[in-house]
């Protein structure tokens, strides 16, 4: 089922929420309608957690997640970290990462098996991504863009990549990820996915 939703008149709902097959994160301080829509649709299946990251309502660009784990930036407070650990299922590992590229959601795109990462991430960060999320990690660009998490969204069943991704790159990425991909836009033409 598809539901149209905005966060304070902003259609970029992925900035203010993040969803996996195991849990959903929703920004605190938004309208009750925004949160209640997630709760109505998902609460019977997975926990829906109101949270902030690094004292902000910006969730999507700051976190990297799958059903196995949640990676948060070093700017995440101890209180936020404890709140996430208390609210998420015990099977989900929550890990704060000491990485200078702190907008993890913009730098990493992942599903439950593979992560594509910004090519400048530290090796230690790549190892944490592999360990916490239980994925294979590949440094990659999408249509020449290093912010792979901004220009690619992948699930275990498929993905959407930047509209200027070449056919050759699309085929190579699809083979690497083992899921079908399509090049396109969101929100009436935005290349940032």
Curated annotation (Swiss-Prot):
Record-level Gene Ontology MF annotations: ribosome binding; translation initiation factor activity
SMART domains assigned to the protein according to its UniProt record, in alphabetical order: eIF6
Subcellular location: Cytoplasm; Nucleus, Nucleolus
Keyword Lipid metabolism part of the UniProt annotation: no
GO BP terms in the entry: cytosolic ribosome assembly
Alphabetized NCBIfam families for the sequence: eIF-6 (TIGR00323)
Subunit structure, as described in the record: Monomer. Associates with the 60S ribosomal subunit.
UniProt xrefs under PANTHER family: TRANSLATION INITIATION FACTOR 6
This protein's name: Eukaryotic translation initiation factor 6
């Amino acid at each position: 089922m598809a539901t149209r939703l905005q966060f304070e008149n902003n259609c970029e709902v992925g900035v203010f929420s993040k969803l996996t097959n195991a849990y959903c994160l929703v920004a605190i301080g938004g309208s009750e309608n925004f949160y209640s829509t997630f709760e109505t649709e998902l609460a019977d299946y997975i926990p829906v957690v109101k949270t902030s990251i690094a004292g902000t309502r910006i969730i999507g660009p700051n976190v990297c997640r799958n059903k196995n784990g949640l990676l948060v930036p070093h700017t995440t407070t101890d209180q936020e970290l404890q709140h996430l650990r208390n609210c998420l299922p015990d099977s989900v590992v929550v890990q704060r990462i000491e990485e200078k590229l702190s907008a993890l959601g913009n730098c990493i795109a992942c599903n439950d098996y593979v992560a594509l990462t910004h090519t400048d991430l530290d090796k230690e960060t790549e190892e944490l991504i592999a360990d916490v999320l239980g994925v294979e990690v590949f440094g990659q660009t999408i249509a020449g863009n290093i912010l792979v998490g901004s220009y690619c969204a992948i699930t275990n069943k498929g993905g959407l990549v930047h509209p200027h991704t070449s056919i050759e790159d699309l085929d190579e990425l699809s083979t690497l990820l083992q899921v079908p991909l399509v090049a396109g836009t969101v929100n009436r033409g935005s290349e940032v996915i």
